[in-house]
């Protein structure tokens, strides 16, 4: 079955369709990871996006029940050079094509993904639509140009109701802006008691749970659209230790008076080098974001930059000068990706311990 990708600049890529036969539109982005496609396509941060994978062969080890980052993928499409029809791995339970059909996600294979990636790098992120060949291309282009960027992605992927995960250790409130499952697992591995709450939870509701710390999760979209999160974080500063990841990092920055801006084509992949400014040490990190904190906006804030991207110098980590709070733009939980930054969860545990000790001695 032939299928095409139409971009808002008029570019057309014709290839073979797989997965669902739905017509879907969204922001077309690219991911440079070589493995981890199951975790990637189930990452809620990709809500509403059509994802191009730059590695040429995808699907060769199949899909299993353990590697999902959410059970209901929110991506609007998947584009690959070649989709493997016959996966081979002892953990495999179904093919990529089978999963996409079940989750109603359209796929496109057999196109020049390198050309598409170069196009996005040159012109910036573009809106696109996956559709059959018998459509009016010019009409689709005009519709894409006229379609506003959604502002409700976080509400689509955040938990509807709070829930509790018992544990003998530190009590953590995990604010779900589109949380990856492995963030919760990292807290559970450290024996934390976790309360997962929706994105619109107020600071008063958080404090009522008596947390030792608050973790602000990853999520999709423009951080400026999540005003509830900014207000909540602002009202929590100084009252409880904070740790922000990805979107949570951006919301933390906004709450402290900084600004964010959209990147030309974003950072998406499991091979992004990050430098810690104080030591010069390099970590290879998993990343998935289209926005960044503007360094010039930090001048009149109490924030300092702790980490920066090696490739383009953008901010990858922040810490508060006064309060026990820090954040990173990348994903220390990996999944998929390297575990160089996994120690940040241990740092969060130590921050909660030291803050509690300080409170007892005051």
From Swiss-Prot:
Binding site for L-glutamine: 45, 219, 221, 247, 250, 288, 290-291
Keyword Ribonucleoprotein: no
Start and end residues of each stretch annotated as CPSase: 1-168
Subunit structure: Composed of two chains; the small (or glutamine) chain promotes the hydrolysis of glutamine to ammonia, which is used by the large (or ammonia) chain to synthesize carbamoyl phosphate. Tetramer of heterodimers (alpha,beta)4.
BP GO terms, sorted: 'de novo' pyrimidine nucleobase biosynthetic process; 'de novo' UMP biosynthetic process; glutamine metabolic process; L-arginine biosynthetic process
One Pfam family hit: GATase
Family from the record: Belongs to the CarA family.
Enzyme nomenclature, EC number: 6.3.5.5
Keywords attached to this entry: ATP-binding, Glutamine amidotransferase, Ligase, Nucleotide-binding, Pyrimidine biosynthesis
Organism: Halalkalibacterium halodurans (strain ATCC BAA-125 / DSM 18197 / FERM 7344 / JCM 9153 / C-125) (Bacillus halodurans)
Disulfide bonds: none
Domain annotation Glutamine amidotransferase type-1: ranges: 171-358
Chain's role: Small subunit of the glutamine-dependent carbamoyl phosphate synthetase (CPSase). CPSase catalyzes the formation of carbamoyl phosphate from the ammonia moiety of glutamine, carbonate, and phosphate donated by ATP, constituting the first step of the biosynthetic pathway leading to pyrimidine nucleotides. The small subunit (glutamine amidotransferase) binds and cleaves glutamine to supply the large subunit with the substrate ammonia.
Cross-referenced HAMAP family: CPSase_S_chain
Protein's pathway: Pyrimidine metabolism; UMP biosynthesis via de novo pathway; (S)-dihydroorotate from bicarbonate: step 1/3
Signal sequence, renumbered to the chain: none
Catalytic activity, reaction form: hydrogencarbonate + L-glutamine + 2 ATP + H2O = carbamoyl phosphate + L-glutamate + 2 ADP + phosphate + 2 H(+)
Name of encoding gene: pyrAA
PROSITE patterns from the UniProt entry: GATASE_TYPE_1 (PS51273)
PANTHER family, alphabetized: CARBAMOYL-PHOSPHATE SYNTHASE SMALL CHAIN (PTHR43418:SF7), MULTIFUNCTIONAL TRYPTOPHAN BIOSYNTHESIS PROTEIN-RELATED (PTHR43418)
Catalytic EC class: ligase
SMART domains cross-referenced by the UniProt entry: CPSase_sm_chain (SM01097)
UniProt-annotated catalytic positions: 246, 331, 333
Protein's name according to its UniProt entry: Carbamoyl phosphate synthase pyrimidine-specific small chain
